[in-house]
Design a protein with these regions (language model features):
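Bacterial N-terminal signal peptides that target proteins for export
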Residues: 1-10
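Gram-negative/organellar outer-membrane beta-barrel architecture
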Residues: 87-234, 242-243, 264, 295-302, ...
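C-terminal transmembrane beta-barrel domains of outer membrane proteins
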Residues: 46, 243-397
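Soluble N-terminal domains of membrane-associated systems
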Residues: 12-13, 26
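Periplasmic polypeptide-binding modules associated with outer-membrane biogenesis and secretion
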Residues: 22-102, 112, 128-144, 205-209, ...
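Short acidic/His/Gly/Ser-rich catalytic and metal-binding motifs that mark active-site loops
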Residues: 38-39, 164-167, 290-292
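N-terminal signal peptide c-region/cleavage motif recognized by signal peptidases
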Residues: 18-20
């Protein structure tokens, strides 16, 4: 009789020994701390963690996933039974932002109302205006981010203003000056082809009405096809991004000759050691038949060595360097960075130019707000001897 009872007592133990890999699966996700963000939108981003064995859950992976949104200042998660409990603290994402900047060759400021979490669904909306030393402009845009269960994302934008445009060579000599009124509007759709790959098409209208038609005024309908590959990762200090974007545009001119353009932009940010990362970026712009009023400056290739009033029909440039996060403070992360940059440009009204030199600056990434607030840098072009200094606070454009 005693042996019979012992047999029944040992059966559960034998069963557990036969299935040692038995584990709990995450079947439910609870989110705490949301204020503006709709829970359903955030749950979509966390779907990959559902039906995952509890012992396979990686808190750092979840933190990295949510840091990509740039909407949360605090993220915590723990598994309790079969429930994943996520606690977040949202950044301020709807704010009127006064901004100003001053550079050695320009100055400006204005006010923008930015919502980086429009309607609580992680869309982005902007409306505002600015003035500078020789122009004013108003603008508005809305960007609907593609969600997991939607077929595509879309964006719409419009802007208008007036400027006294001056085109200079790299030494700062004035080559051309004209007054012009501008208006632009665009609509585009985009689709995620893979977690790291997105395709987009867009079109619209661009009007540049030049006083006395010198150079020629332009009314252009652009059609753009773009492909962007990108990945992001959170290292505890910085949100690092690696990306490559290629776009081709055919510009139908209703008043003059049509023309085409190709643009490439790339960036690489990589964590090296604690609070230190490698930063590199570069670009290419090619549009040999571009009209004067549509020529681009060095911002097309993400370089800051030239005079901003220098316009080109083709250029290539880039830079590589390091950025160090000084400390994690209650307000955010101050950082210093240094790069060496180089550029070649086929200017529209003078000879080809090249330049290279160091760039050093300071940034402040705000903890409670979903955008950086301060960027100060100094650049020196070794080839021409040009110093450029820029200091900006608030919204960057």
């Amino acid at each position: 009789m005693a042996l019979e009872k012992l047999k029944y007592l040992l059966l559960p133990l034998l069963f557990l020994m036969a299935f040692p890999a038995w584990s709990t699966t995450i079947t439910d996700i609870q989110i705490q701390g949301l204020k503006r963000t709709k829970p359903a939108v955030l749950l979509e981003k966390l779907e990959k963690f559902k039906d995952m064995p509890a012992e396979d859950f990686d808190k750092k992976q979840l933190e990295s996933e949510l840091q990509k949104t740039q909407l949360f200042s605090h993220i915590d998660a723990q598994v309790s039974g079969s429930t994943l409990i996520v606690t977040v603290e949202e950044k301020f994402s709807l704010l009127p932002i006064p901004f100003a900047y001053a550079a050695s060759d320009s100055w400006g400021g204005g006010l923008v109302v930015l919502d980086s979490n429009a309607f609580g669904i992680m869309d982005q909306a902007t409306i505002g205006g600015f003035v500078s030393a020789d122009s004013w402009r108003v603008l508005g845009s809305y960007n609907h981010i593609q969600k997991n269960h939607s077929p595509f994302g879309w964006n719409i934008s419009a802007n208008g203003g007036k400027s006294d445009t001056k085109i200079r060579n790299d030494e700062g000599d004035l080559l051309l000056s004209y007054e012009n009124t501008v208006f632009g509007a665009s609509f585009g759709i985009n689709r995620r082809l893979a977690p790291w790959l997105r395709a987009s098409v867009s079109s619209g209208v661009n009007l540049c009405n030049v006083q006395d038609d010198a150079p020629h005024s332009q009314l252009i309908i652009p059609a753009t096809l773009a492909l962007t590959a990108s990945t992001t990762s959170w290292d505890g200090t910085f949100l690092n991004e690696t990306y490559l974007s290629v776009s081709a545009t055919y510009n139908t001119s209703l008043w003059h000759e049509s023309y085409s353009s190709i643009a490439v932009r790339a960036g690489y940010q990589q964590h090296l050691v604690q609070r230190l990362r490698l930063i590199a970026q570069g670009g290419l712009f090619y549009s040999p038949d571009v009209p004067v009023v549509s020529a681009r400056n060095q911002s097309a290739v993400m370089v800051v060595l030239l005079n901003n009033a220098c316009r080109s029909s083709a250029m290539a440039g880039g830079g590589v360097g390091l950025e160090w996060g000084i400390a994690q403070t209650r307000f955010g992360i101050p950082s210093i960075y240094a790069q060496y940059q180089a550029i070649w440009a086929d200017t529209i009204m003078s000879d080809d130019i090249t330049g290279h030199g160091p760039v050093a600056g300071f940034k402040f990434y705000l903890k409670k707000f979903a955008f950086p607030a301060v960027d100060i840098f100094t650049a020196y072009n070794v080839k021409t001897g040009l110093f450029r200094t820029s200091a900006g606070a608030g919204f960057s454009y």
